[in-house]
């Protein structure tokens, strides 16, 4: 009986570890998607860059996107 319980728990642990690994592989944020300011989660070769929005000289908040590393946007 102890062997069956141990085997069941070991199998459950292995299945849980496989599931967590599969979730981590596809968890990156794609290009152009909104991200957070912690700079984590963007897919490889992308960085989370944040820009402040202004309307009529009043700041309306900050928005962050996953974009190519080293690219900056400016209003001309």
From Swiss-Prot:
Cysteine pairs bridged by disulfides in the record: none
Coiled-coil residues: none
Signal peptide: 1-22
Localization terms from the record: Secreted
The protein's name in its UniProt record: U7-lycotoxin-Ls1b
MF (Gene Ontology): toxin activity
Family in the record: Belongs to the neurotoxin 19 (CSTX) family. 07 (U7-Lctx) subfamily.
Tissues expressing this chain: Expressed by the venom gland.
A GO cellular-component term linked to this record: extracellular region
Main location: secreted
Keywords: Disulfide bond, Secreted, Signal, Toxin
Pfam families: Toxin_35
Post-translational modification: Contains 4 disulfide bonds.
Propeptide residue span(s): 23-26
Keyword hit for Ligase: no
């Amino acid at each position: 009986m102890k062997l069956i319980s141990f085997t069941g728990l070991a199998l459950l642990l292995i299945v849980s570890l496989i599931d967590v690994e599969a979730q981590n592989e596809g968890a990156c944020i794609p290009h152009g998607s909104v991200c957070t300011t912690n700079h984590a989660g963007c897919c490889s070769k992308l960085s989370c860059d944040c820009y402040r929005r202004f309307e009529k000289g009043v700041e309306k908040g900050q928005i962050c996107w996953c974009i190519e590393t080293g690219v900056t946007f400016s209003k001309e």
